[in-house]
Amino acid sequence: MSLFTFNPKSARIALSHKRLADAYRRVPGAEIPVVEPGARAPIPDGTDLEKLDDFDRLLHDAVAWANGLAAGDNDWPPMINTLCGVVFVAEAFGCQIVYGEGDVAWTKPVTMDIADVWKIKPMKVGESPLIRRLSQWIDYAQRKLGTDVPTWTMDLQCPFSVAAHVVEPTELLAGCISDPKAVHHLCQMVTDFSIEHMRQHLAEMEHPSFPGRNFPSISENVGICIADDTPLIMLSPQMYREFSLPYNNQIGEAFGGVHVHSCGDYRHNIDNLLQITNVRSIQAHAGPGEFPLPETGSEDCPFNRARRKVACFVDTNGLARGHYRTDARRHYSEYVLPRVFSGDTTGIILQSCGTGDGVPDTNAALAWTRREVGKRKTNT
């Protein structure tokens, strides 16, 4: 008996896939997908200490999330959760995994000295504990659930971000000035490992979904997600071009497309990001508290240059809302939607407004957001 409460081949799920595929391809005049990843059930924590050793608990949470995604008028299709990949490649380079508040996985650096990178060698791909556990989980989930529902591909961390785990971050940044050859050596090692690891990861899934974690995903191979938080935020445009862009380019070339996740305000590096080989989309936590959007679509600014070239997944959270923190609908009606609809909406993917401010649950948030999108599309 299936554990799923939905038909994976339903017309509603097929419609979600079409809307997202059109957005990622930037089809003019296509419907704007309205998505909510936390519908009915939260995204499972993929590196929870207890659940890593209990695949039945991981399975329960993965099924609950997929059922929740399918339960409402949601353009985020149901999928099987994998594991959050923030620390995976860093562990393979020797980082010790530590768990902080809320059992969030992080790392201890391998070294405090940039000169040590010449002595660092990664494990063979597939042999580090977390990557091996990820492979085992994918195999277990596919045997238990079948493959009609796609598996969410993992979030590959960009090479410079991994380097900032391996070498203490301040030392790594100083090394960009004092010993750039060592920084490039480490980033190239991480790039080579990451490409081989991601190819292995994709080969393990009979039905992967793309671009993967952080993004609403579809069965069509539109490229992979890279999480680019550290360099996009921390590096100047000049340093990003030297120490991050060449390695992201190699990943974009290898997989035919990249979709860039980053938290925070990375507007100063958007023009660099748009130079990544085969970049397909970006994610922005939109709001005055995190990633401010321009007031109009005609303004000459990095975000508007991005929206004319790639798809844009516009989402939000409590931090991004800033002074709208408890006013979910007002944040969207006064801030996000007027700015999104002041320009071309081709390629826009929009998360729901969220709960609070009279919005009792995620289904209500989806319904309200979809109505507001419909009104604005009618008036443009």
Task: Please identify what each model-predicted range represents.
Residues L69:
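N-terminal beta1-alpha1-beta2 module of alpha/beta enzyme domains
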Residues M1-L52, A62-W65, D73-T82, D103, ...:
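Active-site loop segments of alpha/beta catalytic cores
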